A protein has these predicted regions:
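Conserved alpha/beta enzyme-core scaffold
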Residues: 1-265
């Protein structure tokens, strides 16, 4: 979240956002005019808040293009990019309307003659990732479910990483199994505790559900104007990420840390 906030502060335009599970940050990018295309498998804050109303408005009005893939297909696109191959064969999306997106093609299995989907590789220009810890060489460790981050990092041309903790390389060597992103693919590393907030960072702090409730109520009441006010208050007004965290307060951050400890033991 720290890096996404900085991109918004720089008032970038014309970006394509690609993420398997796209959350409210995409709404911030749409309303701020930073993105004109979103490639995803799902978009919303979470089940309690339903389908993104902002996404519906911007897509249906033609202001933003949305390209929908299956969860597996997007994962395979990143995996193909990480492997350096042009596509990977799969059964995903066959027989669905999603086959019409992104120039998806089919091929014949040379062994059985069956029809397969040829899922094209995805090579992001820039990958923005957050990890639990990293050493000074950029070797990154992720606790819990690593999602697609390792493949995304290998597929991207430029990789920007924020980390909760900086560790000595001796610690990296002591637990090589935890290192899922090697330093040779990382271009920039920034130490940013709570860098994923108000989202969760497994084992360290939980997502601030109350904050998302407040945000969703603002969207329900004011639509895109509510999002614009949110961007002004949480992105442009705080001069630093520390100032941004001050908007939540230390007690609130500590509460999310306690919730994470309760869930992970």
């Amino acid at each position: 979240m720290a890096l996404l906030r900085e991109i918004l502060r720089q008032r970038r335009r014309g970006l394509t956002l690609t993420r398997n599970l796209t959350c409210y940050e995409a709404e911030l990018f749409m309303v701020a005019g930073a993105t004109e295309r979103i490639v995803t498998a799902w978009m919303g804050i979470g089940l309690p808040w339903g389908v993104s109303k902002i996404m519906r408005h911007y897509v249906e009005s033609g202001k933003v293009a949305m390209e929908e893939w299956s969860h597996l297909a997007l994962g395979l696109r990143f995996r193909a990019g990480a492997m350096g191959v042009p596509f990977l064969p799969s059964l995903t999306m066959l027989g669905s309307d999603l086959m019409g997106v992104g120039g998806m093609k089919t091929l014949e299995d040379p062994y059985t003659g069956a029809t397969l989907a040829a899922v094209p590789a995805l090579f992001p220009d820039v990958a923005v990732l957050h990890v639990h810890r990293a050493d000074r060489f950029g070797n990154c460790q992720i606790d819990g479910y690593p999602h697609m981050d390792a493949d995304i990092a290998r597929a991207a041309s430029t990789v920007l990483v924020t980390t909760e903790e900086l560790i000595p390389e001796t610690e990296t060597r002591r637990h090589p199994d935890r290192t899922v992103i090697p330093g040779f693919v990382v271009d920039a590393l920034v130490h940013v505790p709570f860098g994923a907030f108000p989202h969760e960072c497994y084992g360290l702090y939980e997502a601030d559900v109350e904050h998302f409730d407040e945000y969703a109520r603002a969207v329900d009441a004011r639509g895109a104007d509510g999002v614009a006010a949110y961007v002004d208050r949480h992105v442009h007004t705080p001069a630093t990420f520390g100032d941004y965290l001050e908007l939540f307060g230390g007690a609130r951050l500590a509460r999310q840390q306690a919730r994470a400890r309760e869930l992970t033991g």
